[in-house]
Amino acid sequence: MAHQKEQRTFALIKPDGVQRSLIGEIISRFERTGLKFVAFKFLVPTREQCFAHYAKDDAWCVKVGERTITGKKEKGLPVEKSALEYGRDILEGNVRFLTSGPVLAMCLEGNQAVGIVKKLVGGTEPLTSDVGTIRADLTIDSYEIANADDRCVRNLIHCSDEPKEAERELKIWFKDGELISYHHINEVTLYDVDLGHILGK
């Protein structure tokens, strides 16, 4: 079993993050925490890759579809489809957006990497995400505007929610051997039990 400081997580800068030239800003925020990158991949995803990534079944589609129906009723808008159909439309919209242009897939490693990256990224909706997070600081989209325009919310980046999800997603986006194991000088400062030999004491 790997040491906690070797935990790995997955993050993906979406097409809107790439098009707004925010790759450097986002990467620097991750690096400043002390996490290290062990893989990058710049690509235009396939539909198959995206459906595997989202891994949503009909139960999920019904659940989000029901929320869509509730929202339409609250606004006095007509309900023209079933919850399942609305949910499938949402999933299709997510896939269509993710395949619309280049993305940057990343693997980061370090102590509590999953939780650290999730904290930096912020909540799914930029409008309500905590101040200081990537989504709150770098974009102003909201569910309300996205729903009105019949599109997915543009929130710049995806990250894994938990370690098992990170393991699953990394296998979708990276092949065996593409995750690089190496020593980074920062690890000595972050994790070494005794800094005396570094500080000359």
Where are these regions (language model features)?
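Non-catalytic terminal and connector segments of soluble metabolic enzymes
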Residues: 1-201
